């Protein structure tokens, strides 16, 4: 597998990141807390996916070649694009587990 050099977000994933930030701000009313959490989320994605692109489990129920990584209750759906040497985040959403 070629080395993955960057992470890109689909429009849907970028929108969902914004909604997650909005939700955290609504709950905390703290811009600092929101920025810190979003920074940790993005740092986690970068640290894990750039070093270990296959860290997520295969999640074909979401589409062909999709993998799923979970961070603090948020599912991160992505695919590995070997030709472009990148990770493509397709969606991020909250797992509402019982």
Roles of regions detected by a PLM:
Residues 1-63:
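Basic, Lys/Arg-enriched alpha-helical interface segments
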Residues 28, 67-98:
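Enriched for short, Lys/Arg-rich terminal
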